[in-house]
């Protein structure tokens, strides 16, 4: 009974935001309304497993990490200072925005409680919320990094409140608190967290606004949270404050602008391009959509329409990821979409999904769901391992073995974001407007909807994303006329994305087939939807068949990294080639246009997947460096989201279409077969991976670095498989001048192992520290089982190495 009452409360309050708003003081809202996730029961194998893992593993694991990393202790410390038990506390984590991770996991746990009652979890939340409430200052201020008053102070935290709007994250933390508090209230009916949030929001509303302090949050998020407070309370000042913060961006009358990084370079209604920090941007665009829907401000809609076009035209990865560069975690310029260095942050993927859902709710156009589906099945779900305990912060489209999922991060925004997003996935499946049901995603599910007085049970049966057959049973309690609009995905219409950024190499003549009660029905598309309006009776069924051939994708020619390359798709899934399936390497493979590719289902891989099989050309270096040997080789690709579950190695989404673009696999060398060890337990695998750098500042391939260590003596060591006679080494230095803090070293020397000791070699020349070239030193031949380089770093800088080669005595040097 308690579960039923909880679901009723959650559903009623969410639906009230859309269906009874005029009676409650809300005059406007989104014209298209999502069916709440609490109403949708997911029954398919693919999503059920992921949702269950999030519920049973990820949420509790994230709370555990918040405890172990001091995030929860921060609230306890702040409470101790506030109560007078301590004069100063100790900030126990790293960043002032760490409070937000706790809030996000609470939000995810609350969503989980809405559909999976758990008294133990509910009690844990009550205890945690009590700690948060105890940390709140008397006037509502809640920001542990300042209340703790730690010595030394936390980075970015100024002496006075709101003193560092650019990086302080006070308002960012508050926004996530509001979202979590609303979720908890809707799930449990308890006000213990909501009252904390409202007290804080009232304080902020008393400080900021017209005639008060003028400022824009450095990191957008509070706007979304304020809108959710408004929806629950109907208190207009929260909506007004959200709009105020948006309108303050680009307004230099009372303050210095933060610039493009924070989308603070222009007023939001004048912005047309996606620039700066990608997560900040996506949250801002989502907040603008919310405020536009609730206020009717068409200038907001016009702006985010322009920005959306800018993104899909040249700033989105084929996986749906956004934010190309790690410099500022930001959007790059048009068509700047590198693969190996792609940032594509998991939080940005989540933000992209949130934004595109809102764009659909504004416009009712399937193109937004096409983008949402792309990111959901590819660049977002890749951010969490199948186990639910390992995470990607960034989601590159190419790897040389330097990437692996992490159990947590010092900046843990992505794992906590995953924990709150996953339970909401069922809420993206269906939507409605008046008497029309929109079927947006194809997931085996059940839902009951009220279509303008028609009570209708919907059951969707499908093995999507592996198979394209979908059956939707429409079961009204009484016969009646209403409409069902079914999205026909863009990928079935030879359009992978709603622009010319990506295209299929060849058109498919296979078309989606629609049947109603077994009879094939012609359909015209209305904004990407097949429209079916009729008098429905119990047991009526809509059947769809989406052909799922393997498709080759090519990029716009301005995407320089993808020239001459192809990506593989099947249905909504983007595929990648990974080393375990392709004889240990991927970079030496070429996939000619005419190669036959076929899909093959594997029940025993990654909880059941469909792979792509075929033949490729494999390139290997011949007897000398200028000779290339090409052979035919079996090829297999797996869904992109499933990579990096079997250890570190090569992976690529984009594959060369001709041999000239593939890398001939070098012959093993004394260096490449050596065991590498490095001071400070650094991973040294990059120094002998045989990838040739373009220059010292090349970030496209792995490199060894000692940053943030500066001014010290460091070392890197090779242990040979057997004693070798060697007479020369070459080092290619990493130097990221203009981007980071690594420089060529002051000096270095080579040593060899003799009787367990390291002895300097007798060198015949100087030890070079030149950039953009190999620095070779020859020495008297020695027989040894290992070499070591000792490297003296510059006083205020770190250092790094791209490649370290070793030459055998008697072998002619190149």
Language model segments and positions:
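Bacterial Sec-dependent N-terminal signal peptides
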Residues: 1-25
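Short, surface-exposed beta-strand/strand-loop-strand elements in extracellular ectodomains
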Residues: 172, 497-506, 510-516, 739-755
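Non-cytosolic beta-sheet module surface loops
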Residues: 462, 474-478, 488-490, 534, ...
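Aromatic, loop-rich ligand-recognition surfaces of beta-strand-rich domains
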Residues: 662-663, 697-814
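C-terminal beta-rich recognition modules with glycine/proline-rich loops and embedded aromatic residues
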Residues: 304, 370-378, 383-473, 493-516, ...
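Flexible glycine/proline-rich, aromatic-decorated loop/lid segments
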Residues: 258-261, 316-334
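Asp-box/WD-like beta-propeller blade repeats and closely related beta-sheet repeat scaffolds
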Residues: 148-168, 194, 199-217
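Aromatic (Trp/Tyr) and acidic
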Residues: 26-119, 123, 153-187, 220-237, ...
């Amino acid at each position: 009974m308690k579960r039923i009452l909880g679901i009723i409360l959650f559903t009623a309050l969410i639906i009230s935001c859309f269906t009874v708003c005029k009676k409650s003081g809300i005059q406007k809202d989104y014209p298209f309304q999502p069916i709440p996730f609490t109403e949708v029961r997911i029954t398919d194998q693919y999503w059920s497993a992921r949702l269950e893992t999030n519920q049973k593993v990820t949420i509790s694991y994230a709370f555990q990490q918040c405890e172990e990393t001091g995030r929860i202790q921060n609230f306890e410390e702040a409470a101790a200072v506030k109560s007078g038990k301590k004069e100063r506390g100790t900030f126990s984590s790293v960043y002032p925005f760490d409070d937000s991770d706790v809030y996000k996991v609470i939000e995810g746990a609350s969503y989980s409680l809405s559909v999976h009652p758990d008294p133990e979890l509910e009690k844990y939340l009550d205890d945690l919320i009590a700690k948060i409430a105890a940390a709140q200052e008397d006037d509502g201020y809640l920001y542990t990094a300042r209340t703790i008053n730690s010595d030394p102070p936390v980075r970015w935290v100024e002496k006075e409140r709101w003193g560092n709007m650019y990086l302080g994250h006070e308002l960012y933390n508050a926004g996530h608190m509001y979202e979590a508090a609303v979720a908890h209230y809707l799930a449990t009916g308890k006000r213990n967290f909501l009252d904390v949030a409202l007290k804080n929001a009232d304080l902020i509303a008393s400080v900021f606004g017209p005639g008060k302090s003028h400022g824009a949050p450095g990191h957008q998020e509070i706007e979304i949270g304020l809108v959710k407070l408004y929806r629950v309370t109907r208190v207009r000042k929260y909506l007004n404050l959200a709009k105020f913060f948006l309108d303050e961006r680009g307004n230099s009358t009372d303050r210095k602008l933060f610039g493009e990084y924070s989308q603070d370079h222009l007023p939001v209604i004048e912005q047309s391009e996606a620039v700066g920090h990608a997560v900040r941007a996506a949250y801002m665009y989502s907040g603008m959509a919310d405020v536009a829907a609730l206020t009717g401000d068409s200038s907001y809609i016009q702006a985010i329409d322009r920005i959306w076009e800018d993104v899909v035209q040249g700033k989105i990865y084929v996986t749906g990821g956004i934010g190309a560069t790690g410099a500022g975690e930001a959007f790059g310029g048009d068509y700047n979409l590198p693969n190996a260095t792609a940032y594509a942050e998991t939080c940005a993927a989540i933000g992209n999904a949130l934004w595109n859902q809102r764009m659909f709710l504004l416009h009712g156009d399937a193109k937004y769901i096409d983008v949402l589906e792309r990111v959901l099945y590819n660049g977002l779900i890749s951010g969490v391992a199948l186990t639910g305990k390992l995470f990607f912060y960034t989601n590159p489209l190419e790897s040389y073995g330097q990437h692996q999922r992490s159990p947590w991060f010092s900046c843990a925004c992505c794992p906590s974001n995953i924990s709150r997003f996953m339970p909401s996935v069922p809420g993206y499946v269906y939507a409605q407007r008046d008497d029309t049901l929109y079927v947006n995603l194809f997931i085996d599910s059940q839902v009951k909807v009220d279509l303008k007085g028609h009570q209708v049970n919907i059951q969707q049966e499908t093995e999507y994303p592996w198979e394209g057959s979908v059956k939707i049973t429409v079961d009204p309690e009484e016969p009646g006329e209403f409409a069902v609009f079914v999205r026909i995905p863009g990928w079935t219409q030879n359009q992978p994305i709603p622009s010319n950024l990506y295209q299929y190499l060849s058109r498919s003549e296979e078309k989606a087939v629609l049947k109603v009660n077994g009879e094939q029905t012609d359909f015209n598309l209305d904004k990407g939807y097949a429209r079916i309006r009729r008098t429905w009776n119990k047991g009526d069924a809509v059947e769809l068949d989406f052909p799922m051939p393997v498709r080759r994708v090519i990029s716009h020619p301005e995407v320089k990294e993808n020239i001459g390359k192809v990506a593989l798709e099947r249905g909504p899934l983007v595929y990648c080639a990974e080393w375990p399936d392709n004889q240990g390497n991927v970079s030496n493979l070429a996939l000619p246009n005419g190669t036959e590719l076929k899909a093959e289902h594997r029940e025993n891989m990654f909880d059941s997947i469909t792979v792509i099989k075929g033949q490729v050309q494999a390139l290997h270096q011949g007897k000398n460096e200028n000779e290339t040997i090409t052979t035919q080789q079996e090829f297999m690709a797996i869904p992109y989201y499933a990579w990096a579950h079997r250890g570190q190695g090569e992976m690529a989404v984009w594959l060369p279409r001709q041999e000239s673009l593939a890398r001939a696999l070098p012959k093993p060398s004394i260096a490449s077969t050596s065991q590498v060890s490095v001071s400070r337990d650094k991973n040294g695998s990059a120094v002998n991976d045989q990838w040739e750098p373009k220059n010292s500042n090349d970030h496209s391939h792995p490199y060894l670095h000692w940053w943030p260590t500066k001014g010290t003596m460091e070392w890197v060591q090779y242990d040979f498989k057997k004693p070798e006679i060697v007479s020369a080494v070459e080092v290619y230095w990493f130097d990221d001048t203009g981007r980071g803090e690594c420089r060529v070293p002051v000096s270095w020397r080579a040593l060899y192992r003799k009787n367990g000791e390291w002895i300097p070699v007798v060198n015949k020349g100087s030890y070079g520290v030149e950039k953009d070239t190999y620095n070779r030193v020859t020495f008297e031949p020695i027989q040894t089982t290992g070499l070591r380089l000792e490297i003296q770093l510059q006083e205020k800088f770190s250092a790094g190495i791209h490649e370290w080669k070793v030459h055998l005595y008697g072998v002619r040097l190149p």
